[in-house]
């Protein structure tokens, strides 16, 4: 039986350089046992370097890395209680799915019969029972990915590392496999550190998302928190599309601020004391569009696009051009027509100017 003892992950003031380039200046983070945490960010943000240091494929210049409370900072990869699922899956093409899964077990000293029995259990765990005889070339991309996950899980690691595991799959298959990964993680309860640059992927699978920028943590939190309450324009724009517009904080009562956007006023939740100039991050779906002359912000439609399930608008306003997604589609506004815009209560965040 496969039993996983999830471990915690701690980075304490970790620094990593490559020659004169500082990839990670000073990183501290904690990942609780049994959670799936995604390192998210654009190319070059340091997420892959962080994962490689956790795996033991790179070593920091300073600081400490702990897995399950044990200092592993300078331990080689083969002495760390982690398993990694690579972007390319790294399956042996001449070996069956069963032999691929059993390979690591046999390499660690388990007898062949025991290794194969446990490998069969691993394949069953990921929904591939009865397919162990197939070669990788006889499996779909999603099935190959599940073989790679099974191979990692049968080693019963404290932490499972996933490096862009869905990047080689088409869009429809990515949705299916990310659901499989999330369901498997919740069912077994292993600790997982997941690296991706895909915001939708991160939102779908994560207990917590750590957004990185230039080797530092830009913001960390639950998926909904990062999407609905971004701390900066970088987070707002990176976690899905957002209109970032200037505003003025008129007054504040508790955790709610009254802001003026152009000639329109709107109440929005805020973090801590606010006054003076600021910015609003407004999701495209948080703007309603109606006929001209109503109460709200006046605008003029520049472009429209019908996409089946919604209509997209670009509307020129006194605070700039706003991108709007209308899912209700009660009335289609024509290009060049005058309209009135209003903000919904959700999908709007007050951020620093």
From Swiss-Prot:
Residues reported in the UniProt entry to bind ATP: 41-48
Primary residence: membrane
Entry membrane topology: Peripheral membrane protein
One term of GO molecular function: ATP binding
SMART domains, per the entry: AAA (SM00382)
PROSITE patterns per record: ABC_TRANSPORTER_1 (PS00211), ABC_TRANSPORTER_2 (PS50893), FBPC (PS51242)
Signal peptide coordinates: none
Pfam families tied to this protein: ABC_tran, TOBE_2
ABC transporter domain segment(s): 9-239
This protein's UniProt keywords: ATP-binding, Cell inner membrane, Cell membrane, Ion transport, Iron, Iron transport, Membrane, Nucleotide-binding, Translocase, Transport
Any one GO cellular component localisation term in the record: ATP-binding cassette (ABC) transporter complex
Intracellular or extracellular location(s): Cell inner membrane
E.C. number(s) listed in UniProt: 7.2.2.7
Catalytic activity: Fe(3+)(out) + ATP + H2O = Fe(3+)(in) + ADP + phosphate + H(+)
Family per similarity comment: Belongs to the ABC transporter superfamily. Fe(3+) ion importer (TC 3.A.1.10) family.
Role summary: Part of the ABC transporter complex FbpABC involved in Fe(3+) ions import. Responsible for energy coupling to the transport system.
Subunit organization: The complex is composed of two ATP-binding proteins (FbpC), two transmembrane proteins (FbpB) and a solute-binding protein (FbpA).
Identification of the protein by name: Fe(3+) ions import ATP-binding protein FbpC
